UniProtKB/Swiss-Prot annotation:
Protein's name in the database: Small ribosomal subunit protein uS15
Known role: One of the primary rRNA binding proteins, it binds directly to 16S rRNA where it helps nucleate assembly of the platform of the 30S subunit by binding and bridging several RNA helices of the 16S rRNA.
GO biological process: translation
CDD domains according to UniProt: Ribosomal_S15p_S13e (cd00353)
One term of GO molecular function: rRNA binding
Record HAMAP family: Ribosomal_uS15_B
Native source species: Mycoplasma mycoides subsp. mycoides SC (strain CCUG 32753 / NCTC 10114 / PG1)
Amino acid sequence: MVSKEQKLALIKEFGGDEKNTGLAEVQIAILTAEISNLTEHLKMHKKDIPTRRTLLKKVAQRRHFLDYLVKKDVNRYKEVIGKLGIRK
């Protein structure tokens, strides 16, 4: 789970304003943070199947946001994957 402070920092970094939470970039950044937290959890708890399912759902959700961003603005897409270190 991403803390409130981490989420607020991501919103400010990718959205510009703390009320601008709906941007695809902000959603992708928050999902990426949640995915990394779940990945770390699964490294320690390998048999936690419900968490693995949640991880896969979040990865798919992030993929949808990335696909949307590619259709709308390729430059913003490249900027986001560069900042977050996401593979294409």
